[in-house]
Amino acid sequence: MLAHLNSLLVSAKLVFSVGGAREGAKLLSFDRQVAEIVMTKQDVSMVGFGRRTSVHAAWQWVQTHCETLSSEISSLETAAGRVLAEDIMSDCNVPGFARAMMDGFAALATDIGGATDFSPVQLKLVGEAWPGQPINRAVQQGEAVQVMTGAPMPAGADVVVPVEMAERLEQPGKPDETVRVSASLPAGKHVGNIGEDIAVGQKVLPRGRRLRPQDLGVLSSIGFPQVPVVKRPKVRLCLTGNELLPAGSHPEKYRITDANSPLLRPLIQRDGGDCLFDGITPDDPDAILEVLQQPADVILVSGGSSVGAEDYAPQLIQKWGELPIHGISMR
């Protein structure tokens, strides 16, 4: 559920309430009332849920009442898991040059047409090209250049013969070396063309995408040291209950240890939110109201959200705002 809020802005506070297994999850809000759901202003305590809303209708309400958060700039080092605020368009080709896709020999396809194991073609070796180190001459008819994978293609060459299909020959007493080619390959074979991976003007990543580590590699390859991302929603955790002991405490008679905040806090962080949590809130309406009125984009209430005598959260929201949804039909 939290993942769906990662790229949303709550125009007014949203309050989500997490109940037990029997109760399911409850969705509460200070914001405008959804048209399909009608609630009276009666006290909801000790009378049962007036109606249970379907999960689909609840999500529709959330999507209707949320807008995109404002954006900020993030460096690539901190952008993993963030949500893109804009489409990313490439202003360059990747690669920006034709390159060899195999270790072998760059040559002219017309020179090796018809070459076989039984009838090889010999070419004059005129140099070498390495990644980042091109050869400063063009390949002429009857010539070849040894290339490594990723090396810029020499001018004039239009095919790379893999080392498995060629043999470099050194002839004693002769300064010139030759290459014996035993395969016929078409022009363009084993050659990476300009813009083959990413072309100028291409939409590389869409707005709203949650960035993965591999996306950051793509962004770096097109020269983006930083990217516009949606601000993280501030999610305030309101954990209520007089019976609760701090997380990690040993259970005592008639009291239980907080097991929800250790679960919810990392879930909020995992799904893109910044968790705000000031500790356990007692079952006191004034104390709960104080938490609900603190600045936040989303408030997640755990406990005190059903229809019991001390379930104050629904009453407070109904009194100080609106309660469009109270009770969701789910297990």
Model feature map: region roles:
Residues 95-98, 193-194, 328:
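Short Gly/Pro-enriched turn/cap motifs at secondary-structure boundaries
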Residues 19-20, 24, 104:
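Residue-identity detector for glycine
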Residues 2-10:
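Extreme N-terminal basic, low-complexity initiation segments
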Residues 255, 261, 270-331:
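Short glycine/threonine-rich loop/turn motifs
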Residues 16, 30-117:
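Short, low-complexity N-terminal leaders and the immediately following helix N-cap/first helix
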Residues 40-53, 106-282:
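Short, glycine/charged-enriched hinge/interface segments at domain edges or termini
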